[in-house]
């Protein structure tokens, strides 16, 4: 009897993932000043991509390009693998890309529920003869309260002015608003800037929760400690150029800190 050599079965290869949001060799120039040079970046569902850098590194230009505020001078923006020409932040939001800027786009004297529904107001009944229908305040209050609670944010009262909340609470409300209204990827502009340890921890826990919900998160920060607490992927910008592109498994906190020195 002749032994037959058996070829082991091939190990199935994982299909390549498609990023929710990506930049392909993007350059952004303002006249002769190149603010962002040949930037390539991929943001995947269920991952936190941290973009670090000092002032003037190009972080603000990156945010404006990803959010649809500015068009790239060269290169491509892709959503779900398809090249898109984002015309505005509203266009980006319609495609599931939402940005929470440092100013949070909140109206301080308005209650929490009004800020939660800002731009998404629910009215009672149809709009007859050009007349503005009244807001369905009770529906929006109930939904705001239940939506925040479902995301682990338990505010005693959503009818108080949002200015009465702590900085960390305002941040998580702004992030929760983006999640509730359909964001698949969220861009967070220095969400822990000027916050204390406790408030920063609140925001970072919510970033982790957004990741666990399957969102792609871009965390813009100058704080490597905060980045390493939640990050899966780290990008370091300097003078508009990518100086580091590393996965969490490829870099230690000490190495990340040293790169920023």
What is each of the regions a protein language model found here?
Residues 3-5, 15-261:
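Glycine-rich phosphate-binding loops of nucleotide-dependent enzymes
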Residues 9-13:
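Intrinsically disordered, low-complexity terminal tails and inter-domain linkers enriched
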């Amino acid at each position: 009897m002749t032994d037959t050599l058996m070829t082991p079965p091939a190990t199935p290869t994982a299909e390549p993932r498609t990023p929710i949001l990506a930049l392909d060799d993007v350059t952004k120039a303002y006249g002769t000043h190149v603010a962002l040079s040949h930037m390539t970046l991929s943001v995947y569902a269920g991952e936190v991509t941290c973009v670090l850098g000092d002032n003037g590194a190009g972080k603000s230009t990156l945010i404006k390009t990803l959010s649809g505020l500015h068009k790239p001078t060269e290169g491509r923006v892709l959503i779900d693998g398809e090249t898109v020409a984002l015309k505005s932040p509203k266009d980006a939001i319609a495609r599931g890309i939402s940005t929470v800027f440092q100013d949070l786009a909140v109206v301080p004297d308005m209650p929490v529920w009004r800020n939660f529904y800002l731009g998404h107001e629910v009215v009672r009944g149809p709009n007859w003869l050009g007349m503005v229908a009244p807001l369905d305040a009770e529906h929006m209050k109930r939904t705001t309260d239940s939506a925040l609670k479902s995301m682990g944010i338990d505010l005693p009262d959503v009818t108080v002015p949002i200015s009465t909340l702590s900085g960390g609470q305002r941040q998580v409300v702004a992030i929760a608003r983006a999640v509730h209204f359909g964001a698949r990827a969220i861009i967070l502009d220095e969400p822990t800037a000027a916050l204390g340890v406790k408030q920063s921890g609140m925001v970072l826990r919510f970033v982790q929760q957004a990741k666990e919900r399957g969102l792609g998160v871009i965390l813009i920060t100058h704080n490597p400690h905060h980045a390493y607490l939640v990050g899966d992927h780290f990008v370091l910008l300097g003078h508009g150029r990518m100086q580091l592109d590393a996965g969490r498994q490829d870099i230690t906190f000490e190495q990340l800190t040293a790169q920023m020195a």
